[in-house]
């Protein structure tokens, strides 16, 4: 079968499988590509191909992730699946694979297990917006009441982590049986089609970066004689137009200025948008009033903060991280967007220390404020060497 051309006209949604080891995440991923393929919406990717996922580096951390894609009538999906539990944690914390929604796989034979909980908690912490449940291995449970009990248990667990457990879709099926299908009309294929329909209707289409308020991390500052000060960087979100007011946020007191020019590849433009590497000319701003590490943003859209809570993954020794644990009072650099800022870490009560390879909750107070919102990713460094990665989960001050 020739590779089907993907229609880029459909909305694009990033999704992934989460759940306990051996509950069937990878089998389900393969089954989705098979059934979608049989329905004429993509190419089948076999279990073994997904399972031997290549390793990628994100913020200096090695993560094994498999990427597959498929379509429904309504959407184009990019789907991530990780072979190992540690890969999931790293993936969710670093945001290596951004998830607009997740498929939580729970084996009906086991019910929710420790990693089920951990993945739900992480999804909540890192802000995965929606979860759809696939209750797998239902062919191995004869008792209808038992299936109902497991479903109830999963719903209650999701509710306890502030997901709408009573309302979200739970699909019962068998990924293995679906993999044996030769046609999308077979009974065993129906749960997979139902799951895709549930993803279409329940997982919300993400707001496109270009529709969000303007933000550009400042990478460099130049002064151009007779014209003023130019800041350069890659526009993270939104659009900047000539003549618009912007704020310079972070490190120092927030300052207001006006964009008097946008240029890209030495050409003058009337606007810059998400994804563009641009130079922005600022009216009346002096070269020494702005620095790398600050951001240029739409007025009032983002504020500077010094105290926050974060979920962090600490690199193991094998990953080039620390060789020894650290304790409350640890003072590394936090690398946000384009710059390092020193901060002091306080661990949660009852947590004595954090070992290399652990994930933990940090309470951080930084010496300078940084423009931040929950969901912002950062690296933790010691003398320029990455020793961890994290995501802001809550602003404290």
Curated annotation (Swiss-Prot):
Classification via Gene3D superfamilies: P-loop containing nucleotide triphosphate hydrolases, Translation factors
Keyword Transcription: no
Protein residues bound to Mg(2+): 26
Listed EC numbers: 3.6.5.3
Region G2, residue ranges: 60-64
Region G3, residue ranges: 81-84
Entry GO CC: cytosol
Pfam families to which the protein is assigned, alphabetical: GTP_EFTU, GTP_EFTU_D2, GTP_EFTU_D3
Binding-site list for GTP: 19-26, 81-85, 136-139
Region (G4): 136-139
Residue ranges of the region described as G1: 19-26
Domain called tr-type G: residue spans: 10-207
Catalytic activity, as annotated: GTP + H2O = GDP + phosphate + H(+)
Classification via InterPro entries: EF-Tu_GTP-bd (IPR041709), EF-Tu_GTPase (IPR050055), EFTu-like_2 (IPR004161), EFTU_2 (IPR033720), G_TR_CS (IPR031157), P-loop_NTPase (IPR027417), Small_GTP-bd (IPR005225), T_Tr_GTP-bd_dom (IPR000795)
Keyword field: Cytoplasm, Elongation factor, GTP-binding, Hydrolase, Magnesium, Metal-binding, Nucleotide-binding, Protein biosynthesis
UniProt GO MF annotations: GTP binding; GTPase activity; translation elongation factor activity
Subcellular location: Cytoplasm
Sequence segments annotated as region (G5): 174-176
SUPFAM superfamilies: EF-Tu/eEF-1alpha/eIF2-gamma C-terminal domain (SSF50465), P-loop containing nucleoside triphosphate hydrolases (SSF52540), Translation proteins (SSF50447)
Family: Belongs to the TRAFAC class translation factor GTPase superfamily. Classic translation factor GTPase family. EF-Tu/EF-1A subfamily.
Free-text function comment from the UniProt entry: GTP hydrolase that promotes the GTP-dependent binding of aminoacyl-tRNA to the A-site of ribosomes during protein biosynthesis.
Subunit structure: Monomer.
HAMAP family per record: EF_Tu_B
Protein name per its UniProtKB record: Elongation factor Tu
Gene for this chain: tuf
